[in-house]
Amino acid sequence: MFLSLLLAGFLTFVELNCENMFDCRHDSLKQDYEWLPEGKRHWTPARYWRKLNNIGQEILSCQEEGVPDLVAVVEVENDSCLFDLTRRSLLRNAGYEYLMTESPDERGIDVALLYQPLTFRPICYDYLDIQPLATMNPTRDILYVEGETLSGDTLHVFIVHAPSRFGGEKHTRANRQLVADRLLAAVQLLPPAAKVIIAGDFNDDATAPALRHLENSGLHNVTATATGSQGAKGTYRYQGFWQSIDHIFVSRSLTGHVKRAFIHDAPFLLEEDKKYGGVKPFRTFNGYRYQRGFSDHLPLVVRFSF
């Protein structure tokens, strides 16, 4: 009874870009050739399983006691990867179920929500498709999940992987604005007091126009100033500079329930940045050089109290 009451009072939400979680089998409908054993990255079964176990270890380490209740993962290829991650990797005893998109992204990457059935019961889910502009390639759908927590609260969760800045930030800005507009249109269909969480890799920092648009529309970026205990000042590091391109937004109705928001930068997720000094995420690949690491992004963690 005491444990149930304790679990009912708190909920841990994690967001993680998994850095190309591909299996090593070819999907004839997708451009996944470099993620095959004979491809440029020599993506063998041994490397695939190391990747899954690394991501499983990373997720488990985000909470000292128990496991995170909800985990938004982006940059995952397909259902096979999620099945192997939740049923056959180091994460197999955690009891996660999952929901994921089937997007038109040309490389085949998608987003997903891992959830603990004990503390989160999905009521319904849907995919929000992004109709691409004339100048952009097909991109990832937004995953929407409505579910009930152990405390009886209903959450509306949106998981995003916005288009990249490849081709230049200004040139691609409209692509990310399109995703923000699609998000807001969906949120505005919900009741005014709905408890909303929006998480993912937005490929923009908190001051970008698309993200300011979300803030100006009543959503609060609870991870805008998040840092880590080991020196991380962002979730991603490029040429010696930390960047926060992963974000977790909540509706006004949830703002008062946020007890803590931080970047999980456990020492084993970091490596020395020999070129620029300091530390950086211990990634799987540096260019095409295999490093046996975890991800080029660090996870965000938000702790809620209900």
Model-derived features: positions:
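A long, amphipathic alpha-helix that forms part
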Residues: 170-193
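Active-site environment of divalent metal-dependent phosphoester hydrolases
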Residues: 78-80, 106-108, 165-167, 203-209, ...
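N-terminal, active-site-proximal structural segment of metallo-dependent hydrolase catalytic domains
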Residues: 6-93, 99-111, 181, 195, ...
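Structural recognition of the beta-strand scaffold that forms the well-ordered cores
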Residues: 12-15, 69-74, 97-100, 111-115, ...
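Metal-dependent phosphoester-hydrolase catalytic domains
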Residues: 185-196, 203-306
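Active-site His/acidic residue clusters
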Residues: 29, 150, 158-172
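Second-shell loop/turn segments in exported
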Residues: 39-46, 67-73, 100-101, 131-133, ...
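Structured beta-strand-rich core segments of catalytic domains in phosphoester-bond hydrolases
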Residues: 70, 76-162
